[in-house]
Design a protein with these regions (language model features):
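Serine-hydrolase catalytic core recognition
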Residues: 2-250
Length: 250
């Protein structure tokens, strides 16, 4: 059978495995036995068929992320991927601004330990001295139902708290400019972005929001009511989850 192997810092590899084994018993001996043993060892570890990296792959040429995480006050581990600037120096006098990339929808993790070919946007941040962070809240799926169930009938509530916890941790780092933290997201991430700007402007100074839902009573029912119940049964949940409720006092 064929399987793939990768992680956030390792390009995808295509490997061949086999459950069948060449004989290593008394029926074979000498060079045949040694050859069979070598072949079986290869099949145990996987025979490399293709390597996305290529022979000239040099990880130092790319802006690769590192895994980071925080633990909330109530015990949820929240994972993230942080990409540092190319000229990063944790001891430098000059500090770095931070760009958060968020989503926040239930059971939709953005942080995955898998290879993503570095794109132009990520490289732009790295070349321009900006720390780039992709982070997830408790409801993204990494904490199972214990985290996901907390989003039921109260979308955005715990997600916003978790992203604020992320920002609080990040701005405490000695090499971060606490007054230059921005956030960006699309779809549910657009909703999250505007909510963060309205509810936590002391943490997030600017944002770019696209395609968000700003009043859940106007969105499609098959998604909304799966997580929020109906507006008639959950009026308070819909009120709190509406960007308009928070934007009026912004």
């Amino acid at each position: 059978f064929v399987a793939t192997l990768d992680n956030a810092r390792t390009p995808t590899r295509l490997l061949l495995f086999s459950s069948e084994r060449l004989p290593e018993d008394a029926s074979v001996r000498g060079k045949t036995l040694e050859r069979n043993r070598r072949r079986n060892a290869q099949l145990n570890q996987g025979v490399l068929l293709r390597d996305m990296a290529g022979e000239d792959y040099d990880p130092s040429r790319y802006c690769l992320p590192q895994e980071v995480s925080i633990v909330t006050e109530d015990g949820f581990r929240l994972p993230g991927l942080m990409t540092l600037p190319l000229d990063f120096d944790s001891t430098a006098v000059a500090k770095y601004p931070v760009h958060f990339e968020v989503y926040g929808g239930p059971d939709t993790p953005y942080v995955r330990d898998r290879w993503r070919t570095p794109g132009e946007a990520g490289r732009w941040f790295a070349e321009n001295g900006i720390i780039h962070l992709v982070v997830d809240p408790r409801s993204a799926g990494h904490n199972g139902r214990a985290g996901e169930d907390m989003a039921y009938r109260q979308l955005t509530v715990w997600e916003i708290r978790d992203y604020v916890a992320w920002a609080g941790r990040v701005r405490s780092l000695p090499y971060v400019r606490a007054d230059r933290i921005g956030v960006e997201g699309f779809s549910f991430g657009g909703t999250t972005t505007v909510m963060l700007l309205c509810q936590a402007p002391e943490y997030f100074r600017c944002g770019i929001a696209g395609g968000g839902v700003y009043d859940w009573t106007l969105y499609d029912t098959h998604y909304t009511e799966r997580f929020m119940d109906t507006p008639q049964n959950n009026p308070e949940g819909y009120r709190v989850a509406s960007v308009l409720e928070w934007a009026k006092d912004y």
